Structure formats: C-alpha cells, structure tokens
UniProtKB/Swiss-Prot annotation:
GO terms for biological process: chromosome organization; DNA recombination; DNA repair; mitochondrial DNA replication; telomere maintenance. It comes from Trypanosoma brucei brucei (strain 927/4 GUTat10.1). This is ATP-dependent DNA helicase PIF2. Its EC number is 5.6.2.3. The lineage of its organism: Eukaryota, Discoba, Euglenozoa, Kinetoplastea, Metakinetoplastina. Its main location: mitochondrion. ATP binds at residues 456-463.
Length: 1048
C-alpha cells in the first residue's frame, strides 16, 4: 500500500436529514480520497465515523495530526470519531446529540464492542476549516483524547512543543494519541500494512516518525512492559478501552514531517503483563494512564486517583504528584511563589475549605518572611515530614494496630471490644490467686460453661471478679466479648458498651448481627440498666446468627449487676424476663469489700439498699440543712465533689466554680486523628471492575469466592481445624467498595500465624492476578497497597465521626490555675482513673517536662502532634500542658492521651483516635454517672432538688469507702425507695455455696464440643513447635559432629 493510501472504514450508520445510509468497510486509494470527502461534505452530514481498520485486534492505534485550529466562521471539513473508546465529535452540538440519541436507542456499538459515548464538554466541532488544507491538499482532522471514558475537559492541555528548525509555520502542539483496543485477535504489524508483527522490535525507523513513537513509548515503559506479556504468560482479559497521552518533546522528533498529511501508524501492544513491583508501599499489577494512579493525599489523608478534584485543586500551590513515589510534592515552584506573593499582597484569600493542620502549617510557612528558595524548601520538607510520620507505622505486607490497642491473646476479635483500658495499676496485677474464697468459687463455677448471673450489692467486688473471669476464659483459648451497659463500667472492664459492640441503634435493633457469631462467651456488666426487650432481642439474634437452636445460640452469657441499684429508664426491668429466669444459674456475692473498714456504715447501706432508713444513719453520716450547706461549702467543704440530679446542674456548677477562679482561662480542644486499621492485616488488594457499572457485579458471589480462596490456604496451615468458611468470612475477610469502579480487599492475619505462613499467605494472595480473570468474577487485580492509610470510605468516616462526637473526651476542656480536676485514664501506679487533683500551673508541652512513663516513642509522637495542633490550628504561641497536684507529693505535667473509638466491622475495622488531655472538671457529677465508681475525697450529696427515685439514694451514698467523706443536704425519708419486685428477686438469690444447676440448663458449645475450643489447638501448636526445636537441635548436633569428623 502506498504512503498516500488512507484507511477508511465504516463504523455503522451516519445520519442525514432525510434518511440513513450504510457505508461498507473498504479501503479507498488516495485518488478517490478527495472525491469521497467532497461528496460527504456537500451533504447535510451530521456525523462521519473514521475508525481504525485494525480495531478488532489487540493493537494500539497511533494517530498523528498537525493542523491549525478551526477559525471562527469556517466550514468544518472533516469530523472524526475514535472507534476504540467511542469519543464522538459531530459537526454541531445538535447533530451530535441526535446521533447519540439514535445510537443509544438502537444499542449500536463500535467494532471494538465499546458502547458509543461522547464527552459532556467535547460537543463543539474539533475539525479544521476548509482553509486548513495540507500540502497534499487533503483536509485532515484532529483527535481529542479522552482518558477512560472521561471527557478531555478533565485532562490538562498539553504544552506547546518546540519543533525542529524549519520554515516558520503556525502549528499547534504535536500530540501522540495512543488508543488501546479492547478485543484480542490478530495483531497488526508495526506500520499498519503487511502481516501482523510484534511490538518489541519495530522496523528500522530511526529516522522516521514511527521510530520516534517507538522510542517515546519505550522510554515511558509502556512498550517494554507490554512486549514481555507472553513471556510471563499472564493476561488480565478484556477491559474497558483506555488512551494514553504521550507528549513528543522537541528533542525526540527525529525529523520534521515531509508534508502535513495525516499519517496512520499502528503499533501492536501485547496483553498487560503483571509486574512484580519492588516498591515498598505499593505494587502495581498493571500500567495505568496519566491521572489514574492511586495517590495518598496527605492533606485529606485519603487515597485518591491522581486526577481527582482534591489533587487538581493543589495545583494552585504548585503541589502535584511525584510519580516516582506516588506522593505529593512541589512540582511547580513558580506557581507556589506566585500564590505566595498574591496571598501576602492580599490579592487572594486562603480557601475556607483548607482547614486541616497541614494546611495551617503550610499557610504559616507561606506568610513567613523568608527567601524564595528557603520557602520552597520548607514546603517540600513539610510535606516529606508528614509522609514520614505516616510511614513510621507501616510494615511491609503486614498492617499492625496501634501500639496502645489492647488485643486479647488467642482472640481474633478481641481488639474490637477491648479498646480503652481503665483498670488501676494494682487491679491489672490481680489474678485468680488474689481473689477471696467466695470469688474463687464463682470463677470455678463459671468455667463449667453455664449461663450465669452474678448478683451482689455495691462494693462486693463484681467488676474485679469479671476481669479475672475474662482472663481465665481467654487463657483457655476462647473469644470473649467484654461489655457493659454504661461507658464508665465498660472502661473499668477494659471493654466496650453493649450498644457499641453489637451496633444497637436507638430503636434497640442489632445492626451488626454478624458480630454475634464471633464469640464463645459474652460478658455484660451493670445489667440492672439492661431492658427486658433488648436482652430478649440479644438472645434471638444469637440463636439466629449461630444457627443453633439452643439458648443464646450455644454462646455462654455471663451477667453481673445489682437490681437494687439504678435501672433502665422507661423500660421493663430484666427481672421480668422469662428468658433470664429460665436459662441462668443465679448466685449472689455476700462479702462487702469496699467498706470493710466501717462495718456499721456497710450495714446501714444494706438497709438503704432494701428501701429502709437506718435509725442511726445521722450518727454516721453528716446531715446539713440548706443554710448550713452554704456555710459548709464555703468553709470546710470547699472543693468537695457534688452529686446532683441532672447534667444541666452539673455543667452549671462546674462552670460556676471555674468562673470563680481569678486566673486566665485556657481551652484545650480534642484532636481527631485520621482513621487507622485495628489489628494485623495483609496488604490491601485493589480489585477493579471490568465493566464500568459495578452494579452488574455479583458482590455476594465475589465475596464467597474470595472466602473460599483464602480458606484453601488456611486449611493447609498447622491450625486448619480452627477455620471454616463461615468463620473465615466473618472474622478474616474484608471486601468493600472503595471507588466507583474498584473494591478493596484484605485478610486479617491470625494471632498465632508464623512469619513463614505470613509470607506464604502474601504469595497466595498474589495469585489473585491470574485467578480472578480465570473465574470470570468481573474484577481484576489492579494494585497492591501495603499501607491501609486513607483506604476508608466516606461511610466509615461518617460513622467514626459520630462515635467520636459522643465520646466524653471529645469536648473541649476548659481549665484555670486552681481548677479541681479528675483523671480520666491510668498514667502510673497511684495515678489512675478517678484520681482527684488541682491544677497548679502550666508548662511547655515538650518531652523534657513530661514524666518518665511518657518517654516512649508512641507517646512522644502523640505529644509532638498535639503540640503542633495547638500551635497551628488554635493559635497557641507556645503549646502548654497543665501541671496537676494529685496530693502526696505527686505533681506532674499531664500529657495528652489517645482514646480510640470504632474498630468494628461496620467501619471495615477502622478506628479513629481522639487525642486530648485526660482530665475533666471535678466539682460535680450526676448520680447515674458515678454508678460503678469509688470516689476519693469529700463528697457532698445535694438532695434539695432531687425527686424520689428507686435505689438512687443508695447508689449515691455507697460511692465512698468511709462515711466521714460524705455529707448530705436536705435529706428526707421519702427519698429512700426500693422496687418491690427487685427486692423479692434479690432475696431469692442463693449464696455461691448453694448455686443450683437445673436439669434443663445447657452448657455452652465451647464446653460441650471440645473441638471448638482453642486450647487443644494451642497444645497442638506447642507440640509442633517443640518437635521442630528438637529436630533443629538434632540437625545442629549432626552438623557439629560431621564438622569435627571432617577436621584432620
């Protein structure tokens, strides 16, 4: 075929004003070319299709065109359309819309089986006018590239390229548009004529434009990567068509074009090869176009595409993607300097949406008076610093949780329910041998596997007993959910609230039913506040989730609480539940340990508990009249903790007491951290959909297939008996929609998995590259990201934000010198949750002023981040921390502490950290708030505005260890009340020695079926480990012996 031959082929039908005409696919010689065009342009043509005649082959059609833009008022001479991506340009917007409408109704597609689409902002005619005729007299057209079906308006215009020296001719930039076809078939040859050839070595074209294109593709890595596809033997199958824009720089053009004719050049590309990327944080399995690369946006702390709006918006700062490491950096210093100058001259203002800490630090750098080079360097260093902080917690191929996250031994789900620890240092060291005889008997009975209710009055040691029970159960390899009905009780148990653990909404519905089948044992404390309806709903959901027609689905449930304390508001008490009375072995602790030093006061509290007023109560507790109360509070009672009926009164008292102090007010806001993953996980595998409409993908089928794929590997491990398909799906698999066209997939690493098995698991998951296309699930492996940072969804972000807003430490803390505060976490022995102190001053928030127990890398990093947060986002010239005197010579600077919320499956196991000072004003509390706590120091109970409420007075007065701590104002006998049904139930409870096991009681599944227990599995692992060590020792001895024998 001669060089003047032009390839013309029909794409289907084109529209006329009166009728349609079908063009057969033919090749026209150059002599007929001008005649055909003149005839076409003389008719009222709406659209002409000029596709590639090689579109049914796996090729990349490369079209070059160099024409001046259309001059206003000129007639369009030619209109082109891409057959491989379906980007259409009509002679007018109306004509294009008509054609598009007809084609969409008839379902017409291009020869490459790609639906015809048009760019929303590419309606106007792109072809040249009649005056734009080249040397050969042939009118040619200009193709406008469109990446992945998105109009060219979203792609930055290519810069003008300097051409080699020659006659001065006004010509637009030279752009090489590479189209990747979607169907595989016979390959095209390198020049578009002759027999099909390969891409790895084009014909000798060093002085031709074909050689230039080949060199450009080779330099960018496209051609070289694709040419090795057959050697590797991998193929990702059919995918949506894509285009790659390749800019031809001046020094890459070997020679100027001989004429301005449009040249058709076809360069074959083989199926995409799966590259074994050596990158530390990301492994890309395919080659992506410009704008399609995944980038971690350090400003928003989300993983986005490099063409996303959040990335493009940073171009005004001269910040863009550094492709070598997929990170943001200063790529256009001139734009940064220009924006800095306009900002300082107040020609532009700082965008209101740029409010994060990094944006504030960047604004501070730009407004600072410094040389241009130093400013650019500072911005670059600032970005790198934040990226380095993110990378510190990342380990290749393994995602680990936060260092402060509490995870139970042999408990894959333990990190979901044990996030905040509020035990005292002494209580952490207590175990089974430290319990009294009564408590040890309770532990022994619970370990028999029966559902158990543990009753007893305030101060009998129920919370401590539950912690020891959990330790014993976990040591036997069981998964234990430790919950409570109140937040304070949950933190005392190092657990979570029942509502948070199982996703109970305001209507009492369990929104995360799948979590219920993850546990062998469920512990619930403070059940007096648990309603009958919610409890029976829990039993039903456990039965349904586990598929076992036994009480609670075979899960052992341990309840604890005192029904003679405050109960559920506006709900039926649990004592009226037939499920509770029929299925639980019940007992009551008799020995009071809180008021052991005052037996008289302990006896009086027991009478109050039963709703009677002790006749000698005024001899033990100090009662005050209203006038006496005001005088006492100003004198001896100054600084006493006040117990009040409502939250409104508590806030008013705390604020009023703080306003009385003459010193300056300091406000400490809480810092919300970016979501991070809880537990140990593999890398995240990005699965992209083959079709653009992900609704066509059967997500359930995909999930089940991935579960089976992971189970195939786990069943080959030494602990295969512990895994079944439902267990793997509920505990070890996470699959969720991350982008419009992609899913995120990761696998939880079991607690006891060895390093070798972890490496084998990573290799097994890498096999998804070939396994997914072979299964025809509609997705293929796009990329592997070692770090999970930024891979949470908008729904995860919203849920975690709501959780954080409800956390008690999320509110700003207002302090003054002399303010009375209570510690809300455990810092050191003697400085535990509930410790009271006084703010004596403020010191700079730096490592040198903090106590020694804070001197750990994780805590130091949290302190540094919080100091920057105060300086850049809240205007602190110097970040200060309060210095608190806790008495006994303990004066310390209280550092910020990380509190965590979330981490369950409804947020894809992401949790958010709240960094705040672990203090709260301690002038007043509600009685409900202190239920379950033991208060230190003077306590004043204000009853003048208290209404009669069952058990409220008993709960309030039993919070102290010694009656000398307590004063009561406006006491009246009518305030002492007790619910009769709760009293009858409590009287019916037997002591531990007389606990009864009725014939219809069922033992939990973990007790009746030993194979479900992990203890046997642990013994098997220990035996395998010991056997391996013995073999290694024998091998070592043999090698030593052999070496000695070989020595002369």
């Amino acid at each position: 075929m001669s060089s003047k031959t032009v390839v013309w082929s029909s794409l289907g039908r084109f529209m006329r004003t009166s009728h349609h005409r079908l063009l057969d696919e033919k090749l026209f010689p150059a002599s007929h070319n001008r005649h055909v065009q003149s005839r076409l342009l003389s008719t009222p043509l709406s659209l002409i299709a000029v596709p590639s005649w090689m579109s049914k082959c796996r090729t990349s059609a490369v079209r070059l065109s160099r024409h001046p833009p259309q001059v206003s008022g000129q007639e369009p001479c030619a209109v082109t359309a891409s057959s491989s991506v379906g980007t259409w340009h009509g002679s007018s917007p109306a004509g294009l819309r008509r054609c598009q409408h007809v084609r969409s109704l008839n379902g017409w597609t291009t020869p490459g089986d790609v639906p015809i689409r048009h760019g929303s902002r590419s309606i106007a005619t792109i072809a040249t006018g009649c005056g734009g005729v080249g040397a050969g007299g042939i009118n040619s057209s200009v193709d406008v590239a469109e990446v992945s079906g998105v109009s060219t308006s979203g792609v930055a215009a290519a810069p003008t390229v300097a051409l080699p020296p020659g006659p001065p001719v006004e010509k637009p930039p030279l752009i090489c548009v590479v189209r990747r076809a979607t169907r595989g078939g016979a390959a095209a040859d390198s020049v578009g004529t002759g027999t099909p050839g390969k891409c790895d070595k084009p014909p000798d074209s060093s002085n031709t434009l074909v050689g230039t294109i080949a060199r450009v593709l080779s330099s960018s890595g496209e051609c070289g990567r694709h040419s090795n596809a057959n050697q590797e033997g991998y193929s990702l199958g059919s995918r949506p068509a894509r285009k790659i824009l390749v800019k031809l720089e001046a020094d890459t053009v070997a020679a100027p074009l001989a004429d301005t004719k449009e040249k058709q050049i076809y360069v074959q590309q083989q199926p995409v090869v799966v590259a074994q990327s050596p990158l530390a944080r990301s492994s890309s399995t395919v080659t992506w176009e410009e704008g399609d690369t995944l980038v971690y946006n350090i400003f928003t702390q989300r993983v986005v595409k490099s063409s996303s709006a959040s990335i493009r918006a940073l171009s005004v700062l001269g910040v863009g993607v550094r492709s070598s490491e997929k990170e943001l950096s200063v790529v256009d210093p001139h734009a940064l300097v220009e924006f800095r100058d306009k900002l300082r001259e107040k020609e532009v203002s700082w965008p209101s949406a740029w409010r994060s800490s990094l944006f504030n630090q960047l604004q501070h750098v730009l407004l600072k008076d410094q040389p241009m080079e130093e400013m650019i360097s500072r911005v670059h260093e600032l970005l790198q610093l934040h990226y380095q902080r993110v990378k510190r917690s990342c380990v290749a191929n393994v995602t680990k949780g936060e260092p402060d996250t509490k995870t139970e031994e042999a408990n894959p789900a333990g990190d979901e329910v044990a996030i905040n620890g509020e035990m005292t240092y002494h209580e952490r060291l207590l175990g089974y041998p430290d319990l009294n005889e009564e408590q040890r008997r309770v532990v022994d009975f619970v370990l028999r596997g029966y559902n158990t209710y543990i009753g007893g009055g305030a101060g009998t040691g129920k919370s401590l007993l539950l912690r020891v029970i959990r330790q014993e159960l976990v040591s036997r390899g069981l998964t234990v959910a430790t919950t409570a009905t109140t937040g304070i009780a949950a933190r005392r148990l190092n657990g979570a609230t029942l509502h948070h653990c199982f996703g109970v909404n305001v209507y009492g519905e369990f929104t995360r039913r799948a979590e219920l089948k993850e546990f062998d044992v469920i512990i619930i404390d403070e059940v007096s506040m648990l309603s009958k309806e919610l409890f029976e709903s829990l039993e039903f959901q456990l039965r349904r989730a586990n598929g076992v027609d036994l009480p609670f689905g075979g899960v052992q449930v341990i309840l604890s609480g005192d029904f003679l304390q405050l109960g559920a508001i506006c709900s039926v008490s649990l004592v009226h539940s037939s499920v509770f009375r029929r299925n639980f072995a019940m007992l009551k602790l008799q020995r009071v340990v809180r008021q052991e030093g005052s037996s008289i006061f302990a006896q009086q509290l027991q009478e109050l508990r039963r709703g009677t007023v002790p006749h000698d109560l005024q001899d033990t507790v100090q009662f005050l009249s209203p006038p006496e109360t005001a005088k006492w509070l100003e004198g001896e009672g100054k600084g006493a903790v006040k117990l009040l009926p409502t939250n409104k009164e508590v806030d008013e008292v705390n604020q009023a007491e703080l306003d009385k102090l003459p010193s300056d007010l300091v406000v400490y806001p809480a810092q919300m951290q970016a979501p991070s993953l809880v537990g140990r996980w593999t890398a995240t595998y990005i699965l992209e959909a083959v079709v653009k409409d992900t609704k066509m993908i059967d997500t359930h089928k995909l999930t089940r297939a991935l579960e089976q794929y992971v189970l195939d590997f786990l069943q080959k491990t030494p602990y295969a008996s512990d895994y079944t398909l439902p267990v793997v799906g509920q505990r070890y698999i996470v699959l969720y929609k991350l982008f419009v066209d992609a899913f995120a997939f990761r696998v939880r690493i079991p607690q006891d998995m060895s390093e070798k098995d972890m490496r084998d698991l990573a290799l097994h998951l890498r096999g998804l590259e070939t396994w997914l296309p072979a299964c025809g699930l509609g997705v293929f492996l796009r990329e592997i990201l070692d770090s999970p940072d930024g891979l949470h969804t908008d729904a995860d972000d919203y849920t975690l934000t709501r959780y954080a807003e409800l956390h008690p430490m999320a509110s700003p803390l207002r302090l003054k010198k002399g303010a009375k505060v209570m510690l809300r976490t455990n810092l050191a022995p003697g400085l535990v949750n509930g410790s009271l102190g006084v703010v004596v001053g403020f010191k700079e928030l730096s490592a040198k002023h903090l106590p020694r127990f804070v001197n750990t890398p994780g805590r130091i990093a949290a302190v540094e981040n919080y100091a920057e947060y105060l300086r850049y986002e809240h205007g602190f010239t110097t970040a200060f921390a309060p210095e608190v005197d806790f008495g006994g010579g303990r004066v310390i600077v209280v550092p910020p502490v990380l509190f965590s919320v979330g981490g369950l499956s409804n947020t894809n196991h992401y949790h958010v950290g709240i960094v705040s000072l672990p203090l709260s004003l301690a002038y007043a509390f509600t009685v409900h708030k202190v239920q379950g706590l033991t208060l230190a120091g003077r306590v004043h109970l204000e009853l003048s505005r208290m209404w009669p409420c069952d058990h409220l007075l008993y709960v309030a007065m039993s919070r102290v260890r010694n009656p000398e701590q307590l004063t009561v104002s406006s006491f009246h006998n009518s305030l002492v009340r007790c619910a009769s049904e709760c009293l009858l139930f409590d009287d019916s409870l037997p002591p531990v020695e007389q606990v009864r096991v009725l014939p219809h009681f069922f033992q939990a599944s973990w007790q009746r079926t030993p194979s479900r227990r992990k203890a046997a599995l642990q013994r098997k692992r220990e035996q395998a480990k010991q056997s391996k060590q013995k073999k290694a020792a024998k091998l070592k001895e043999a090698m030593i012996k052999q070496a000695k024998e070989a020595t002369p």
